[in-house]
């Protein structure tokens, strides 16, 4: 039997795409790991995710044949391989999936023929090492393999419904309980009889001898709610082939970790950790996890405590813990990035572009976890030593909450020691924390439109892009105390819904408009405008006069000055977003915003505090775009057209088929439904007022614009002038004067410390003579006025040197409080413990304390009890000396 040719991982990628491009397929770039079209999915976990809407008929593409290499992730949610990574031959968090697709074009014959051609003619796999499976009733596929390809029937395995229900089979694919589905045929490679395991469908199929390399799915049915299968008018093909396991076969190795990409990463991990054993499981974990972490960051995910960011944090910390297991105490994980870029940068240019961002984000997380990893491991060791086989849930939660140990990391460590985590107890502790958070966050229930009322209403027509007031606004719904009513009287608090309105309803961070609604003998003061059910503008306010009824026709006008200030801030957030991405990196994404008349607040993803220099550059760039006075263009277009136009969409936002694009010169292009200036120059001035952290991985900038910015600068100048006058100078001299004052203060503090030391030395010089001899040990217990804990410790050191074998208690009294220091020196150390002695004294004066056998400190209340406690020290020492 001839050995198959060897192919590098890069060559396999190139061969696959070139082969199918030659068969008329459009080569489609990999979609990000964060799905853009499926909010129910945490990560892209298969090649078909980016084509899901095409298969469902919700999206049309310009091609009917496609091929791609899709990056995928399985860590978190239903598809989670994290616990197995590093311990098995083929489990990974990150992997690449080769796929070719037909959307109503070719079907089984071509899909099977091309798969066979690529495997046996391009990659030269021996035909006698390949075996296929088909769904047990798919005669067409069976006959194509037997008659067209020429595979013996003995190497074609029929797989039935092996999962307990009709069409529940390894060889029948379905997207959901209803919808597109169909049989599939899988191609397996036989590693040889020296490897344990049987063919698919046999009792030993879970062995490693026969490895699935390619799955060809034939979507030819539409499954109905009653379970019947209706033929699709245009059947489709969806194929998937794991690159890593294919590379293992084409490189003559048995496990995925032996392929070229992983060997290079494991080699780098070996060099960084000093571990020479390249089969070490921890090195495998590190090599796997650097790929997952890096590509998650490339696709806009940063470490945080929720959602996708928390999955990333878990993967990073699992890798760091495996480094810790290998004895690594220095920072190492981020140093893996250059090697990864060398290996995969050509296939994924976006990795090259984001290299610095990836390394910085990993380093920041590495530094953060390094602060608690060692302490957390000591806690785990202590808990494990007290437990039998189970780590209590409360302790697992403490490791999570205090030391940043994700529970699956704790479970991973426990499993290595033959233990497990009490997950029920952990979830109980987590739920208690959630309940506490929910209780703290409650401030009153919101108002919702009843479903039967929504069914009778048309979406509100918003007039506010062009108009600030409007007539003929018909009242279509009216809420009072959260309930629908037909009429309301003067003094009532109401929410008024009209068929049209110039009032902007709060959304996209922009606050709702306020203003006035009026009609014949009716006046309504509108304090706010909120959006209900995503499409109805509710005017929240109070009837000032008259009676309001359903069907009334009103006129409405917004508070023009308030809206005017708000739009300055909203337009400024777009310029700020663009400046942040330019200065900090394209990993920056909006995480939240508030656009109010008096200020703007912008939350964004970033992994470390912004320096003063970076803030200054960001502010200058925004103001430069303001001065350029770009025209602000608004375009309404289809979503895909908008993305092609260069518009930036926000992760997690749901957009309709048609979207509104806001373009500010060539600097900022975003999807936005808010109200804005007509030219950037209208903003006038942009001034950052604060920057800080909101949560892990999320920063916040607050700023003001226009007259608000001018007022802020004027107030800052006033304060600066006031401060300068206090120093007896002007604002240009204040820095020098403050520096001189600070230097003088430091000098005086040093002089004060020196004087205190001299005072303490003088006060304690004669104390040695007052020592009481107790069984050959000198005992001193005295009160020293005005001594703090530091002065007491210095006095203790001098007395120990002076007295030799001794037991010393010093009490420093000041302001009604007492600082205590106890020391044991020389021969009595084994029998008299300073911590016990200090605790004995502190308990008598309403205090507490403790420490080492030779030195302890504490405190308590000053009073008559102190003298009694100190007088009793010699007898206490005598008792303990025996």
Swiss-Prot record:
Reaction equation(s) it catalyzes: tRNA(Ala) + L-alanine + ATP = L-alanyl-tRNA(Ala) + AMP + diphosphate
GO-annotated molecular function: alanine-tRNA ligase activity; aminoacyl-tRNA deacylase activity; ATP binding; tRNA binding; zinc ion binding
Q: Does the keyword Protein biosynthesis apply?
A: yes
Catalytic class of the enzyme: ligase
Question: Which CDD domains does this entry report, sorted A to Z?
Answer: AlaRS_core
Question: Where, in this chain's numbering, is Zn(2+) bound?
Answer: 570, 574, 672, 676
Cofactor(s) for this protein?
Zn(2+)
Read off the Pfam families from this record. DHHA1, tRNA-synt_2c, tRNA_SAD
- Supply one GO CC term from the record: cytosol
Q: Report if keyword Transferase is assigned.
A: no
As recorded in UniProt, its EC number(s) are 6.1.1.7
- Alphabetized HAMAP family for the sequence: Ala_tRNA_synth_B
For this chain, the family text in UniProt reads: Belongs to the class-II aminoacyl-tRNA synthetase family.
This molecule's function is given as:
Catalyzes the attachment of alanine to tRNA(Ala) in a two-step reaction: alanine is first activated by ATP to form Ala-AMP and then transferred to the acceptor end of tRNA(Ala). Also edits incorrectly charged Ser-tRNA(Ala) and Gly-tRNA(Ala) via its editing domain.
Put simply, this protein is called: Alanine--tRNA ligase
Q: What species is this protein from? A: Xanthomonas campestris pv. campestris (strain B100)
